[in-house]
């Protein structure tokens, strides 16, 4: 196993809690916030992947908006244009998990090169990172838009290798999403799965090199 020279992080669900939109959903639709958030996220990913398979790539934000429309229709909720816009804008204000800021700072202090490699658009990645005050921690903010393919497609992971300018075997890819970890491992990255909730790992023919419960543990991995 090669020495780790750089780390690429997934954004949604790894650095940032996608279910931090629950409060906004609950305010809009009392008693239904959590259910909306769960179905919305499920359809967001599903629509992105299906569009990719269909050869009809759209930006992740459009897939997010479409997923919200489906969710409201499925749950028989009235959702006018203004309400939909307010909820989708919550994805620009996602909250980082509690340990993220400290872990990023510690990794940078150890001289580690850091990047985000996300299915989100360039504009959204910049907005989310800026709004959470951690933009100075990253060397690269990488969107899959230039590849026009969503993770876990190999073309998406290739962007991280190109940005860092080093071999994929020297890059650690970190995600809390098993499908993302599997895609990155198949591409050739070293991979770390953040398993915050004690889930079983997906049976996709890949195994993470490291599994940690929270992001702080990555700092100790690098220090070894």
UniProtKB/Swiss-Prot annotation:
Uppermost EC category: hydrolase
UniProt key word Hydrolase: yes
InterPro entries the record matches: 2-HAD (IPR006328), HAD-like_sf (IPR036412), HAD-SF_hydro_IA (IPR006439), HAD_sf (IPR023214), PGP-like_dom2 (IPR023198), S-2-haloacid_dehalogenase (IPR051540)
Catalysis: reaction(s): a haloacetate + H2O = a halide anion + glycolate + H(+)
One GO molecular-function entry: haloacetate dehalogenase activity
Keywords, alphabetical: Hydrolase, Plasmid
The organism's place on the tree of life at top rank: Bacteria
CDD domains: HAD_L2-DEX
Active site as annotated: 10 (nucleophile)
Presence of the UniProt keyword Hydrolase in the record: yes
Membership in a protein family: Belongs to the HAD-like hydrolase superfamily. S-2-haloalkanoic acid dehalogenase family.
NCBIfam families hit by this protein: HAD-SF-IA-v2, HAD-SF-IA-v3, HAD_type_II
Other observations noted: Two haloacetate dehalogenase enzymes exist in Moraxella strain B. DehH1 acts predominantly on fluoroacetate, dehH2 acts on chloro-, bromo- and iodoacetate, but not on fluoroacetate.
Protein name as annotated: Haloacetate dehalogenase H-2
Gene name per UniProt: dehH2
């Amino acid at each position: 196993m090669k020495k780790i020279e750089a780390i690429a992080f997934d954004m949604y669900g790894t650095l940032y809690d996608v279910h931090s939109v629950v409060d906004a959903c609950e305010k809009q639709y009392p008693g239904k916030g959590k259910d909306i958030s769960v179905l919305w996220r499920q359809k967001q990913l599903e629509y992105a992947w299906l569009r990719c398979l269909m050869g009809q790539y759209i930006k992740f934000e459009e897939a997010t908006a479409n997923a919200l429309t489906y969710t409201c229709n499925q749950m028989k909720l009235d959702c006018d244009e203004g309400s939909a816009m307010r909820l989708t804008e919550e994805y620009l204000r996602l909250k980082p998990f509690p340990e993220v800021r400290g872990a990023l700072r510690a990794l940078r202090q150890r001289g580690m090169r850091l990047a985000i490699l996300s299915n989100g658009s360039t504009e959204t990645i910049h907005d989310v990172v800026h709004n959470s005050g951690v933009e100075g921690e990253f060397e690269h903010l990488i969107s899959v838009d230039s590849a026009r393919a969503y993770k876990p497609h190999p073309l998406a992971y290739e962007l991280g290798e190109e940005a860092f300018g080093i071999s994929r075997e020297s890059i650690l890819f970190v995600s809390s999403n098993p499908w993302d970890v599997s895609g990155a491992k198949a591409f050739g990255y070293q991979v770390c799965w953040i398993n915050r909730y004690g889930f079983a790992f997906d049976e996709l023919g890949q195994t993470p090199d490291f599994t940690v419960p929270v992001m702080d543990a990555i700092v100790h991995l690098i220090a070894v």
